[in-house]
Amino acid sequence: MSEMNVTERDPATEQTAAGLSTTRGIATRLSFDPSERERLRSLASRVAELAARPIERKKAELWTEHNDLRSAVPVIFCDPENGWNEIVPASSLQCSDPLARVWEMHLLKEIFWAVEMLDDRVIESFFDVPYNYEDTGWGLHEKRIGGERGGSYTWEPPLKNYERDFPSLVYPKIIVDKSMTDRVLDLARGLFDGILEVRL
């Protein structure tokens, strides 16, 4: 069981269906202890085993037919979104390093999708690492009201007065931290070597 204080920001609970869009802001040691490595490699092995099933190839064919507008049957994609935090509660994660927790959550979601969800989402033998980046934003910032713990929220639109506010809008710049991206990528490759293909 993790010793992370539940009041701290836990990036493992902030994932979408595609995982996290960046590793920026995750306070990781970039080195996992032996129990974390064993846990992650074990989960990755299970994902690889599930990805090798013939049904995954069939699901990929269904999606190709669907995207080519030739599908004879509908394809189903289920994503519990914030429900993931109930399906896989943060308190059930065994890793303590924040990045290890993100990866553990991701692998557990893949396993749940394959074993319990039983939709047409393809389980693949890849482990994708996102770029470590920041963006400069649009120049105006929304104010959210509510939304604690992934709940619903309303927001105040940042563009309230066209004449006054529009000139503040700018195109965001994406700034990639190549060094940190490479370090996280190397960590994943060393961890999942021979189990899952690590991709950037």
Protein language model regions, located:
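Catalytic cores of TIM-barrel enzymes
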Residues: S2-L200
